[in-house]
Swiss-Prot record:
Source organism of the structure: Aspergillus flavus (strain ATCC 200026 / FGSC A1120 / IAM 13836 / NRRL 3357 / JCM 12722 / SRRC 167)
HAMAP family according to UniProt: Phosphoglyc_kinase
Consequence of gene disruption: Decreases cytosolic pyruvate levels and increases mitochondrial acetyl-CoA levels. Increases production of aflatoxin and increases the mumber of cellular autophagic vesicles.
Name this polypeptide is given: Phosphoglycerate kinase
Gene name of the encoded protein: pgk1
EC number(s) per entry: 2.7.2.3
Cofactor: Mg(2+)
Record: residues binding ATP: A215, K220, A239, G313, E344, D375, T376
Subcellular location: Cytoplasm, Cytosol; Mitochondrion
TM stretches of this protein: none
Sites of Phosphoserine modification: S203
Catalytic reactions on record: (2R)-3-phosphoglycerate + ATP = (2R)-3-phospho-glyceroyl phosphate + ADP
Post-translational modification summary for this protein: Dephosphorylated by PTC1 and PTC2 at Ser-203; the protein is cytosolic when dephosphorylated.
Binding site for ADP: G214, G238, F343
Amino acid sequence: MSLSNKLAITDVDLKDKRVLIRVDFNVPLDADKKITNNQRIVGALPTIKYAIENGAKAVVLMSHLGRPDGKANPKYSLKPVATELEKLLSKSVIFAENCVGKETEEIVNKATGGQVILLENLRFHAEEEGSSKDAEGKKVKADKEKVEEFRKGLTALGDVYINDAFGTAHRAHSSMVGVDLPQKASGFLVKKELEYFAKALESPQRPFLAILGGAKVSDKIQLIDNLLPKVNSLIITGAMAFTFKKTLENVKIGNSLFDEAGSKIVGDIVEKAKKNNVKIVLPVDYVTADKFAADAKTGYATDADGIPDGYMGLDVGEKSVELYKKTIAEAKTILWNGPPGVFELEPFANATKKTLDAAVAAAQSGSIVIIGGGDTATVAAKYGAEAKLSHVSTGGGASLELLEGKVLPGVDALSSK
């Protein structure tokens, strides 16, 4: 699956076409169904506006919201999103009470002049995800013929298909892979994701550095395996580093997290790194705590002394930060997935902040810095650094699967240039 040769919205003639766009409007709602964060809606505006400005007859938007488990549930209606979208676009938005069916087709086919239509939640139909849950919460597979019918129903609403929902790209859902139109292109959000991940995974400027944090080695094994033949250096940080330190150097780690299953593959990882001439950088000092809490009694430990029993490492120390900064400054492409410490608790946020500062400095001086979604994207947002980095991925699970070398069904389904 090449990331760099997929058709984009800018390659397609939209004039007088019904443009069917899969967006991600899975926004948080409060008890009164008020949207508490409209970031995802704002993120889709460039694609929606481009379709309107380039002469689309109708702009048909489809999305999921929450987990209604294949049944209509007013709690998960996209209706509040239609109101918010009208405000943001300063343009009327027609809300269709169903995402498929005769009435919806009539609304879409009547539309002219770039009319925006928002369809009701795709996941009100079991055929979107391919399954639903019964009263006992057991998964019930959707009927194959009904899935086909549902996909035909979506296909009937457009002349051109645009996918701008990267966060769902790792799911083979009907709206991601089942729309059968001659041209299937990425919207601006997906286009940017693909461009940047291609810059890292297909043609990186070197030296190429990956910074990997996280709790368990065993959770990141596919990621490490896929990146080792591609990178020049690898910083292993976060709780996962303790499994490396104890296994490789017999460092005392006290009550820090130790991944028994992961420890068995540490040797193989180091071996593979040597074979690929990859420099592995591990932390050398730690900020410790007697409990996992902001008001914990804190301490400091080095490799030589180790972490005493009753204490656990919740962040890395200044010497480690200096090592990271030096490695980051040498790199031309930096991919960061996983923070060095428990940044949610202020006493253990120092290394994360300083690593972020170094990443920002690298981006400002011309390196490509990509944040691979999840917790690290939260870090970038928390400290207001998103605009200062090359790219912050919006897809948690999708980014991870891409970095693990897996094919993303939603990307794979797009037309090639």
